[in-house]
């Protein structure tokens, strides 16, 4: 098996482009990941179009969606239009695969939404599989899902690997293993990163994401809450586990470093970002790659039904939960709410408050 390619999640901001220019000039960026739907409503700058086309023509472009919302309980015109635009995008450029986030964004202003987790349940699994069928049918490419950083409870953390494994089974899909997302869960629920990583089907990992984040003070306990804000350096704890993770992921093809485009402004920040890139490069070069059973991603026939799978009761709960969080309802009030799908009685009060802060920041209504 070849060593995985090292690349970046491309950002259009001038600060980001200035920071990565030395890497582009030295041909160090072996693959680009592009969140294609952030420009669905705008025209790409000419320089960006040319850069993406260059990587596309060399089979080194991968796509990462943000706004599909895999687990919305109702199928909407917005999702239908999203898939139509994605079809146009994959006709325009050659992508090696397309990925999306785990979770749902049940808001009126989806462009300012944030994905929230869903519990493992036969109905949520059925909805997720239906949305993945439609995604793969639209692009006729391998399709993958990224693990989510945010969790309301340790139960969410423990079941996500199993959920994702079941979710991708019918389409021969793959996983993005985001190690900073796992780092957030490890910090917030006081477990070891390795213990969470072991819960994932590592043979299904085709791509790894690396990034940094930030801390916020806990209101309910004497600890700090880790947030996946993509605005800082890769934590040392992630560097510590990365060699082992690379060795365990027998079908790994890509390692992508993520950083928000407006967060690398000073020369010191640029140098530190480049140092992170160089350090990851060294780890990949020094890693011991094991050859596993080669998987042909996305080769199964999809079980696409004529009508999208929907569930009115789940939709009501998603809408009610989002509004409770947006309205800053008390944690105890939310924990006492009667839900069928969401087990709010098990939720951590700090995580409820964190979700409220995120949703208020993005103002989905």
Label each PLM-derived region with a short phrase.
Residues 12-14, 36-40, 59, 67-69, ...:
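Active-site-proximal loop/turn and secondary-structure-junction residues that shape catalytic pockets
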Residues 21-28, 45-63, 80-96, 133-138, ...:
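Acidic (Asp/Glu)-rich catalytic clusters
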Residues 79-174:
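Active-site acidic/histidine proton-transfer and metal-coordination neighborhood
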Residues 136-220:
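Acidic/histidine-rich catalytic cores of soluble enzymes
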Residues 32, 98, 143, 178, ...:
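Conserved, mostly hydrophobic/aromatic
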């Amino acid at each position: 098996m070849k060593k995985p390619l090292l690349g970046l999640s491309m950002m259009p901001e001038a600060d980001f482009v200035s920071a990565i220019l030395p890497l582009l000039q030295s041909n160090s960026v072996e693959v680009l990941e592009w969140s294609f739907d952030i420009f669905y409503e705008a025209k790409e700058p000419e320089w960006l179009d040319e850069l993406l086309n260059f990587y596309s023509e060399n089979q080194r472009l991968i796509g990462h969606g943000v706004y599909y919302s895999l687990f919305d309980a109702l199928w909407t015109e917005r999702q239908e239009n999203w898939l139509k635009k994605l079809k146009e995008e994959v006709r325009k450029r050659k992508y090696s695969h397309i990925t999306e986030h785990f979770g749902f964004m049940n808001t009126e202003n989806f462009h300012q939404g944030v994905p929230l987790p869903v519990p493992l349940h036969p109905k949520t699994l059925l909805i997720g599989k239906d949305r993945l069928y439609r995604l793969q049918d639209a692009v006729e490419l391998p399709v993958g899902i990224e693990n989510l950083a945010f969790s309301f409870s340790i139960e969410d953390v423990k079941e996500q690997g199993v959920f994702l494994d079941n979710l991708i089974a019918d389409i021969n899909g793959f996983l993005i293993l985001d190690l900073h997302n796992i780092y957030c869960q490890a910090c917030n629920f006081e477990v070891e990163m390795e213990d969470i990583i072991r819960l994932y089907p590592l043979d299904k990992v085709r791509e790894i994401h690396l990034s940094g984040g930030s801390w916020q003070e806990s209101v309910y306990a004497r600890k700090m809450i880790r947030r996946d804000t993509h605005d800082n350096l890769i934590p040392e704890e992630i560097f510590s586990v990365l060699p082992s993770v690379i060795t365990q992921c027998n079908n790994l093809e890509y390692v992508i470093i993520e950083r928000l485009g407006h967060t690398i402004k000073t020369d010191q920040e640029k140098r530190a970002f480049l140092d992170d890139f160089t350090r990851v490069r060294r780890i990949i070069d020094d890693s011991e790659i094991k050859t596993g059973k080669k998987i042909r991603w996305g080769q199964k026939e999809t079980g696409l039904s004529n009508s999208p799978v929907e569930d009115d009761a789940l939709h009501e709960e998603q809408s009610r939960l989002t509004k409770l969080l947006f309205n800053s309802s008390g944690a105890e009030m939310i924990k006492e709410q009667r839900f069928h799908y969401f087990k709010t009685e098990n939720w951590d009060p700090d995580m409820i408050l964190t979700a409220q802060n995120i949703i208020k920041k993005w103002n989905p209504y």
